[in-house]
């Protein structure tokens, strides 16, 4: 319970205390997007690592040497908890955005940080918007930003171990032109 409180408190404090940095990043985003990307990515990776530390999470990555570091990758995985995002973001190379449910875009500050790290918001009830989001994701991949998606569309509800298979966690390399 103490770790849970530490995690929630850390995330909340980060969102509040990072407002000045967020405002600066939003101001420089148009003129210096590469600086904005690098700083945003570094700050989010840092806070995710802090949260993982406070939660007592130990990470073991197998096969990371198989992931290309010189181009964008589409990551596909099973969604077990919000920690999937923290673990993935802190372990994959380069810039990586996530496909997230639209409801998260309604949370002030969180939405801004998610946009800065190239997250895409999906309205699961609107097929037309879903197609537009897929096209936006393709553009992100072409521009060099990896994308992570959890195709189930929500976190797994059972405690049973997920079956290993093609969708358990994989990556797809797309050619860039």
Give a label for each model feature.
Residues 22-42, 53-54, 69-127:
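Catalytic core of membrane glycerolipid acyltransferases/transacylases, capturing the structured
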Residues 156-159:
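Short, solvent-exposed loop/turn segments at secondary-structure junctions
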Residues 133, 162-168:
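Charged helix-capping and loop-helix junction motifs
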Residues 170-176:
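Conserved small/polar residues in nucleotide/adenosyl-binding loops
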Residues 72-74, 146-150:
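Residue-level preference for the first positions of well-ordered beta-strands
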């Amino acid at each position: 319970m103490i770790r849970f409180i530490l995690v929630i408190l850390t995330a909340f404090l980060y969102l509040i205390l990072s407002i000045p940095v967020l405002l600066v990043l939003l101001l420089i985003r148009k003129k210096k997007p590469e600086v904005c990307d690098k700083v945003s990515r570094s700050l989010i990776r840092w806070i995710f690592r802090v949260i993982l530390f406070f939660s007592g999470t130990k990470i073991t990555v197998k096969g990371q040497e198989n992931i290309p570091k010189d181009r964008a990758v589409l990551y596909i995985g099973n969604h077990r908890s919000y920690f999937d995002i923290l673990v993935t973001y802190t372990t994959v190379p380069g810039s990586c955005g996530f496909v997230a449910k639209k409801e998260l875009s309604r949370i002030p500050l969180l939405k801004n940080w998610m946009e800065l790290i190239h997250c895409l918001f999906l309205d699961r009830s609107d097929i037309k918007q879903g197609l537009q989001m897929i096209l936006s994701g393709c553009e992100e991949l072409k521009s060099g930003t990896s994308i992570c998606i959890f195709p189930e569309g929500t976190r797994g509800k059972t405690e049973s171990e997920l079956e290993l298979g093609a969708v358990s966690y994989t990556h797809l390399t797309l050619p860039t032109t």
